[in-house]
């Protein structure tokens, strides 16, 4: 079995058929809607909040609201629907979450997207939650995860998941691989490739991306959508504390199972870091779109599907060739 990650891969160009990269279309259909980019910010407290969720929806980007303010979820769904926008929320698998789904159904509050957000998603509890949502809210698009194996993808799809999220601990602020010895850190792109071979429904590649070029690589190896944390963190609009160190501005960024998120030092699988302030999120999204348009032009196409068939080489961690600090 070939094992590789993002840094090990270079995609091989095809003949360009466009006059300008602006002719290339980066939009993606995901569930009932079409979005400008195949990218979603991680549903983490230092990446996503209600104001950003609303802005993303208004501007035709996909988002997933995190689940760490449970009591705010019903008002959030109402607010989004009142504004004529789609609602995309997260749930866990504890007993109160099953009751929450029933409450949504009895109130006729139907989020367009529901993400079951668990670190180890190949589990009976997630399978039971998928079935529960599909029973009570059959029109909601259910994203389930996270998994790292073809078996996990198949079981969640068979339970009724409309999409699966692939990635166990490859993110910058996730230390699952260190604390447990398990995960897809260091071989996330291979894991995505294997899972894609088993998938019949869309996959979200979650974690491990460090550059915009990694979006194109994710699509090449099977992702329909890519979830990104660190590249979206530390913007002007991002949640999180801003600090100044040696004349430079930084913003905090922490993992979803860190003690900073949990409020206690127990079962910690995330850490906190400060990321240099990156300016406007809108500028980053524009740059991301332009870079992906360039990727499509190198693939010899005009849309994302051209990326799925390009050849590649495995270069074993040499693609930065001294260009990285």
Swiss-Prot record:
The entry's active site is 174
The name of this protein is GMP reductase
Q: Which CDD domains match?
A: IMPDH
Q: What is its EC number?
A: 1.7.1.7
Task: Please report the organism this UniProt entry assigns to the protein.
Answer: Staphylococcus epidermidis (strain ATCC 35984 / DSM 28319 / BCRC 17069 / CCUG 31568 / BM 3577 / RP62A)
Q: SMART domains from the entry?
A: IMPDH
Q: Which Gene3D superfamilies match?
A: Aldolase class I
**Per its database record, what is this protein's job?**
Catalyzes the irreversible NADPH-dependent deamination of GMP to IMP. It functions in the conversion of nucleobase, nucleoside and nucleotide derivatives of G to A nucleotides, and in maintaining the intracellular balance of A and G nucleotides.
Catalytic reactions of this protein? IMP + NH4(+) + NADP(+) = GMP + NADPH + 2 H(+)
Single Gene Ontology BP term? purine nucleotide metabolic process
Q: Which HAMAP family match?
A: GMP_reduct_type2
What PANTHER family would the database entry show? Answer: GMP REDUCTASE
At the top of the EC hierarchy, this enzyme's class is oxidoreductase
Give the CC-aspect GO terms: cytosol; GMP reductase complex
Residues involved in NADP(+) binding: 203-226
Family per similarity comment: Belongs to the IMPDH/GMPR family. GuaC type 2 subfamily.
Q: Name one GO molecular function term.
A: GMP reductase activity
Record flagged with keyword Oxidoreductase: yes
InterPro entries given in the database record? Aldolase_TIM (IPR013785), GMP_reductase (IPR050139), GuaC_type_2 (IPR005994), IMP_DH/GMP_Rdtase_CS (IPR015875), IMP_DH_GMPRt (IPR001093)
Identify the keywords attached in UniProt to this record, alphabetized: NADP, Oxidoreductase
Q: Which residues cross the membrane?
A: none
